[in-house]
Amino acid sequence: MATAKKITIHDVALAAGVSVSTVSLVLSGKGRISTATGERVNAAIEELGFVRNRQASALRGGQSGVIGLIVRDLSAPFYAELTAGLTEALEAQGRMVFLLHGGKDGEQLAQRFSLLLNQGVDGVVIAGAAGSSDDLRRMAEEKAIPVIFASRASYLDDVDTVRPDNMQAAQLLTEHLIRNGHQRIAWLGGQSSSLTRAERVGGYCATLLKFGLPFHSDWVLECTSSQKQAAEAITALLRHNPTISAVVCYNETIAMGAWFGLLKAGRQSGESGVDRYFEQQVSLAAFTDATPTTLDDIPVTWASTPARELGITLADRMMQKITHEETHSRNLIIPARLIAAK
């Protein structure tokens, strides 16, 4: 059986009626090419089914057009949304994303990182599990490849980082509750080993102190991201502290579980803090990585830092690095937006 002829750049040039160098300029996105010529070349590429050899392009032009992305856990909504935002933004710039899984504990991170560098990517984004950031940065510097970290907390120094402002988000939620009349506000969720939780609890505590409200350590409860455990935890919390009128929840899962727990206990969730004790109502507030339009219609006030927007910011930052618009490291902190309960 005859083998299909491989379409070359010469075939594209002949079909478009231009020189090979013109086709090369269109493929690389460099040089001054008229719109009409570019459209003619791209039409020929599509008609012939020409597949660009990115490795050869890298040798000719110094860039592959590929950005590596190592994700800690693709099953987590945060990283899935971040990946979607990053990919969409980079593809709009004519780039492709090479996606790899680094492991929840970063056990495969170094091996995956080396693989991307050896593949000749233009840059690498690492989302989560960045404990060995110094080693990775040195490896990237040796090959003059930019690396940017996407983090949920501020534990990285002297590297390019894009992360949410956890303290500001906690301050937004807590102050909103206080201004709605709440004075007895508890915290539910997260593990003490989590840096993200530490920053959020710090913002919560700082806001209580700012308004002269007491901090009760026994009102700050750990809880895994389980609706069942959250429901049980809030039920026990309110049984021992019935005058608590509001609870700040670590994430969407905790908030949903807390809401179910309130319903099961015969209590209600709402917004205002006035006369909450007598009405047996409790206001819920929580952090979310989702976009406002995807939030469930339950009575919860949200501090939203959409992971998809973090991905878009990462893409913009990476383009600045690989086009040399900006070379020094930056820590980009994305503020949260408040979405009041309906």
Curated annotation (Swiss-Prot):
It comes from the Bacteria. The keyword Aminoacyl-tRNA synthetase does not apply. SUPFAM superfamilies: lambda repressor-like DNA-binding domains, Periplasmic binding protein-like I. InterPro entries: HTH_LacI, Lambda_DNA-bd_dom_sf, Peripla_BP/Lac1_sug-bd_dom, Peripla_BP_I. One of its GO terms (molecular function) is DNA-binding transcription repressor activity. The keyword Magnesium does not apply. One of its GO terms (biological process) is negative regulation of DNA-templated transcription. Residues 9-28 bind DNA. Keywords: DNA-binding, Repressor, Transcription, Transcription regulation. Residues 7-61 form the HTH lacI-type domain. GO terms for cellular component: protein-DNA complex. Pfam families: LacI (PF00356), Peripla_BP_1 (PF00532). Repressor for the malX and malY genes. Also regulates its own expression. Binds maltose as an inducer. This is Maltose regulon regulatory protein MalI. It comes from Escherichia coli (strain K12). The gene is malI.
